[in-house]
Amino acid sequence: MSNQHTLLMTNLLPVGSNISTWWNFGSMLLTCLALQTMTGFFLAIHYTANINLAFASVIHITRDIPYGWTMQSLHAIGASLFFICIYIHIARGLYYGLYMNKEVWLSGITLLFTLMATAFFGYVLPWGQMSFWAATVITNLLTAIPYLGTMLTTWLWGGFSINDPTLTRFFALHFILPFIIISLSSAHIMLLHTEGSNNPLGTNSDIDKIPFHPYHSNKDMLTATIMITMLFITLSFLPNLLNDPENFSKANPMITPQHIKPEWYFLFAYGILRSIPNKLGGTLALLTSVMILATTPFTHTSHIRSMTFRPMTQTLFWILIATLITITWTATKPVEPPFMFISQMASMIYFSFFFMNPLLGWTENKIMMNN
């Protein structure tokens, strides 16, 4: 009988002994979720979902409510921290072949879509200039859907333009979606622990498992403490580091900002959207940029699960990371040469990763068989 069965018999969660710090981001995401839910609740108490009062209510929270500025900044910086953690979490999954646990991976992608929707709705709520125009640009993408587009856009707006009903429903959605995220996270964790977590070697670790507590729980607490410390340092010294200067002005439908862009964590998708000079094509590319992650469990061809011992695939992975950084950078620039060309090239390289990965896996298999 393996030590996994012994641990299960004594009611202890068995976990591989060699999982690295990259496995800590799940618990850090849970910490972020708890923090965002709590700060969001206190902000919702004082927020007013009305186009004439929303901007003033955010100013009222930061100026007049005791520790309101702390809650507002924690919630704003916490959202960025959430996305930093989730992107590292996904990158770890791609690198170590965790997508082979299909149920966990696909539930994670559903979680990512829900999180992105929540963040988008939340960005609109302060009703600043960039909030309003980002909402206008993104919701307008629905009009690209043939036949139904205009009807769907009008239905989402609650009228013929972005107005009070739009803000009210966005606030309602922003309030309810975190609870859906909590439910999906529970399902994600339960699905993970039916089979157990993978490890950096990509091997079966049933013969060498240790109890989660106190070993990994202490490890999780350390990284969560480091994360919260970084959050409070940013809050104290650079609270507006990730805010758009345009959002300090109240929304004005009569004045268009010189350069409309979403929050930094959506810039990679926005860059891919802009790189295609066609509304429907750009919208499909935007959706595909995230949905393509769901193909990885079905296109894995290598006999080895993890990239730890696959140098060629490692090179491809780091090219993907560099490409995403490049797309993010070009999305902050105006729609003009050479930025558009760089963005288009980077978008092509991004999508080619998901076609090259199975081909490279097959090539590696051939090399190993010949040796």
Curated annotation (Swiss-Prot):
Transmembrane segments: 25-45, 69-90, 105-125, 170-190, 218-238, 280-300, 312-332, 339-358
Statement: the UniProt record of this protein carries the keyword DNA repair: no
Binding of heme b b562, residues: 75, 174
Domain of life, per lineage: Eukaryota
Gene Ontology CC annotation, any one: mitochondrial inner membrane
Pfam families for the chain: Cytochrom_B_C (PF00032), Cytochrome_B (PF00033)
Cofactor annotation remark: Binds 2 heme b groups non-covalently.
A biological process from GO: mitochondrial electron transport, ubiquinol to cytochrome c
Molecular functions per Gene Ontology: metal ion binding; ubiquinol-cytochrome-c reductase activity
Binding site for heme b b566: 89, 188
Keywords, sorted A to Z: Electron transport, Heme, Iron, Membrane, Metal-binding, Mitochondrion, Mitochondrion inner membrane, Respiratory chain, Transmembrane, Transmembrane helix, Transport, Ubiquinone
Subcellular location: Mitochondrion inner membrane
Cofactor entry: heme b
Membrane topology: Multi-pass membrane protein
Matching Gene3D superfamilies: Cytochrome Bc1 Complex, Chain C
Positions that bind a ubiquinone: 193
Entry keyword annotation includes Lyase: no
Record text on subunit structure and interactions: The cytochrome bc1 complex contains 3 respiratory subunits (MT-CYB, CYC1 and UQCRFS1), 2 core proteins (UQCRC1 and UQCRC2) and probably 6 low-molecular weight proteins.
Similarity remark: Belongs to the cytochrome b family.
Role played: Component of the ubiquinol-cytochrome c reductase complex (complex III or cytochrome b-c1 complex) that is part of the mitochondrial respiratory chain. The b-c1 complex mediates electron transfer from ubiquinol to cytochrome c. Contributes to the generation of a proton gradient across the mitochondrial membrane that is then used for ATP synthesis.
Further details from the record: Heme 1 (or BL or b562) is low-potential and absorbs at about 562 nm, and heme 2 (or BH or b566) is high-potential and absorbs at about 566 nm.
Protein name in the entry: Cytochrome b
Gene source species: Elapsoidea nigra (Usambara garter snake)
